UniProtKB/Swiss-Prot annotation:
GO terms for cellular component: chromosome, telomeric region; histone deacetylase complex; nucleoplasm; nucleus; NuRD complex. The gene is Mta2. Keywords: Acetylation, DNA-binding, Isopeptide bond, Metal-binding, Nucleus, Phosphoprotein, Ubl conjugation, Zinc, Zinc-finger. Belongs to the metastasis-associated protein family. Its main location: nucleus. Component of the nucleosome remodeling and deacetylase (NuRD) repressor complex, composed of core proteins MTA1, MTA2, MTA3, RBBP4, RBBP7, HDAC1, HDAC2, MBD2, MBD3, and peripherally associated proteins CDK2AP1, CDK2AP2, GATAD2A, GATAD2B, CHD3, CHD4 and CHD5. The exact stoichiometry of the NuRD complex is unknown, and some subunits such as MBD2 and MBD3, GATAD2A and GATAD2B, and CHD3, CHD4 and CHD5 define mutually exclusive NuRD complexes. Interacts with CHD3. Interacts with CHD4. Interacts with GATAD2A. Interacts with HDAC7. Interacts with MBD3. Interacts with p53/TP53. Interacts with MINT. This is Metastasis-associated protein MTA2. It is found in: Nucleus. Residues 145-256 form the ELM2 domain. InterPro entries: BAH_dom (IPR001025), BAH_sf (IPR043151), ELM2_dom (IPR000949), Homeodomain-like_sf (IPR009057), MIER/MTA (IPR040138), MTA1_R1 (IPR035170), SANT/Myb (IPR001005), SANT_dom (IPR017884). The keyword Ligase does not apply. The keyword Zinc-finger applies.
Length: 668
């Protein structure tokens, strides 16, 4: 029962999602709501997976410095990987969560130089922290102060003087006497002078306009004049005047008016005092943060002095009593039963044996963390299309520590080529940036799974806006910049305004001429006619004339097909369909063919420039070239006079056989 009893100050696990790791929080308050439920006000602690990569690099450098200074024993890569899961970052962010979402207790300690990091791996539910994370400023700062050692920060203690040895140092330069206990005045005379000093201070506050506003009553003015700063000034006046009461009295009341001594309690306004109380409630006695966030116009010494004076006021005593009474009325502890509901990520296979559910889930897959194939329980992990899973022990580790036991290949470690890659805990840009480290077979599998078919279906109003608001939409310019945002609301509003005023004439529709099926079949057959088989032993002659043939203008600006760019053509049969894999066409040479992987298809298209295209580029004007670039799928119409036809270069007689339509093959 003690394990399910949670008190204020405990570090606990909170579950906000069935598939995400637990949240580590510290209970600050337990409050009962109006409907009877219990809510916990908690302090947020963050994992490494919750902060940016730049802050992770900063944490790594801090960890290396700690290991060097504390002389930590060496650890393996797997242990270092698991130690990152045990590191947390404290914050000053509070939130309220239902107490029913608590899933267990854990331990979080401040890392110090005497700790050995390996000990954290031997303990269950044990974490450490050394840095504080600010979710608003996105910064990491040290949680504990630094002790500065050296002659710049500490006083140099001189050697002890021997008996009878005199100190030759000038004491007047080293110290100043502020009070002489052997003065000629009696204690009664000193007390009477202090009473006169308080009366002078009260009279001075009555004459001061700002003080009369802050202390409107005589009682408050007398209380302010009785504080230490008035008494210290009176005793210092006696010391400076040689304990002559007449001279000291005339110093307290000069010709211009009585001397007014104020401390920090009087210098601060009521609004500044309220700000200080609010900051003290949020940050505690962290005066640097109080000054930085709430009172930047005050000095640190002024804030510290005001704090200790504020603790002597009646307001502080009343607040302290109210907080004590409120704390007594609040809950000190709460009992949360053990959570026994099944997890939605649990894999249940139909027809599996008892105790081995998930056995029929993609047989052959292993645990993404420990790579085991046997487990009493399996859990789905990562994106659904990845079909990744974790065993029972690795799932508990994932929920508690926010990572896998072993580093995956996407995290920089080397794994086997047959192991699946887990990307569920990475964002999409990180997974894409790490894809070169994967093998080609698994990368093709990932790409094939991620390619989803989608359909863009436009509404009637959108199709009307393309024509009516062409000046605002600029469809050609938008097509060249597909990632630039378009203000759809403004275009929709403008289209609604122009629609009633638009002409009612029907649009001219250009009918699409569709060729009959017989014509299409003839064209497909003509593209790849069957060739007679070449008998074995005969070498395919090389057509030297093909190397010097000029390319016609019709195929210069035509976009090349993927087969041409890939370096190997796809064979076609007589009916125009591509041949099945493994069947060699007669039109292809006997050289070794490379099977293309659809997942490795290149995204960019490469255009090879020849002498003809360069001459064509010079013949075109700038406007014609831009128009052709906007419509690369249309043939380019060029006047024959613009192109200079080169005379054919005579070739020497070749002893090779006649030219053939077979492609050129160069054997290695």
């Amino acid at each position: 029962m003690a394990a399910n009893m949670y008190r204020v100050g405990d570090y606990v696990y909170f579950e906000n999602s069935s598939s995400n790791p637990y949240l580590v929080r510290r209970i600050e308050e337990l409050n009962k709501t109006a409907n009877g439920n219990v809510e916990a006000k908690v302090v947020c602690l963050f994992r490494r997976r919750d902060i940016s990569s730049s802050l992770n690099s900063l944490a790594d450098s801090n960890a290396r410095e700690f290991e060097e200074e504390s002389k930590q024993p060496g650890v393996s890569e797997q242990q270092r990987h698991q130690l990152k899961h045990r590191e947390l970052f404290l914050s000053r962010q509070f939130e309220s969560l239902p107490a029913t979402h608590i899933r267990g207790k854990c331990s979080v300690t401040l890392l110090n130089e005497t700790d050995i990091l390996n000990q954290y791996l031997d303990k269950e539910d044990c974490f450490f922290y050394s840095l504080v994370f600010d979710p608003v400023q996105k910064t990491l700062l040290a949680d504990q102060g630094e002790i500065r050692v050296g002659c710049k920060f500490q006083a140099e203690i001189p050697d002890r003087l021997a008996e009878g040895e005199s100190d030759n140092r000038n004491q007047q330069k080293m110290e100043m006497k502020v009070w002489d206990p052997d003065n000629p005045l009696t204690d009664r005379q000193i007390d009477q002078f202090l009473v006169v000093a308080r009366a002078v201070g009260t009279f001075a506050r009555a004459l001061d306009c700002s003080s009369s506003i802050r202390q409107p009553s005589l009682h408050m003015s007398a209380a302010a004049a009785s504080r230490d700063i008035t008494l210290f000034h009176a005793m210092d006046t006696l010391q400076r005047n040689g304990y002559d009461l007449a001279k000291a009295m005339s110093t307290l009341v000069p010709q211009g008016g009585p001397v007014l001594c104020r401390d920090e309690m009087e210098e601060w306004s009521a609004s500044e005092a309220m700000l200080f109380e609010e900051a003290l409630e949020k940050y505690g006695k962290d005066f640097n943060d109080i000054r930085q966030d709430f009172l930047p116009w005050k000095s640190l010494a002024s804030i510290v002095q005001f704090y200790y004076m504020w603790k002597t006021t009646d307001r502080y005593i009343q607040q302290k009593r109210l907080k004590a009474a409120e704390a007594d009325s609040k809950l000190k502890q709460v009992y949360i039963p053990t959570y026994t509901k099944p997890n939605p990520n649990q894999i249940i296979s139909v027809g599996s044996k008892p105790g081995m559910n998930g056995a029929g889930f993609q047989k052959g897959l292993t645990c993404e963390s420990c790579h085991t194939t046997q487990s009493a329980q399996w859990y789905a992990w990562g994106p659904p299309n990845m079909q990744c899973r974790l065993c029972a022990s690795c799932w508990i580790y994932w929920k508690k520590y926010g990572g896998l036991k072993t580093p995956t290949q996407l995290e920089g470690a080397a794994r086997g080529t047959t192991e699946p890659h887990s990307r569920g805990h990475l964002s999409r840009p990180e997974a894409q940036s790490l894809s070169p480290y994967t093998t080609s077979a698994n990368r093709a599998k990932l790409l094939a799974k991620n390619r989803q078919t989608f359909l863009l279906q436009t509404t009637k109003l959108t199709r009307l806006a393309r024509r009516m608001c062409r000046d605002l939409l600029q469809p050609r310019r938008a097509a060249r910049r597909p990632y630039a945002p378009i203000n759809a609301n403004a275009i929709k509003a403008e289209c609604s305004i122009r629609l009633p005023k638009a002409a009612k004439t029907p649009l001219k529709i250009h009918p699409l001429v569709r060729l009959p099926l017989a014509t299409i079949v003839k064209d497909l057959v003509a593209q790849a006619p069957l060739k007679p088989k070449t008998p074995r032993g005969t070498k395919t002659p090389i057509n030297r004339n093909q190397l010097t043939q000029n390319r016609g203008l019709g195929g210069i600006m035509v976009k090349r097909s993927y087969e041409t760019m890939a370096g190997a053509g796809v064979p076609f049969s007589a009916n125009g369909r591509p041949l099945a894999s493994g069947i060699r066409s007669s039109s292809q040479p006997a050289a070794k063919r490379q099977k293309l992987n659809p997942a490795d298809a290149p995204n960019p298209v490469v255009f090879v420039a020849t002498k003809d295209t360069r001459a064509l580029r010079k013949a075109l004007t700038h406007l014609e070239m831009r128009r052709a670039a906007r419509r690369p799928n249309l043939p380019l119409k060029v006047k024959p006079t613009l192109m200079t036809v080169r005379p054919p270069v005579p070739l020497p007689a070749s002893s090779h056989p006649a030219s053939t339509n077979e492609p050129i093959v160069l054997e290695d």
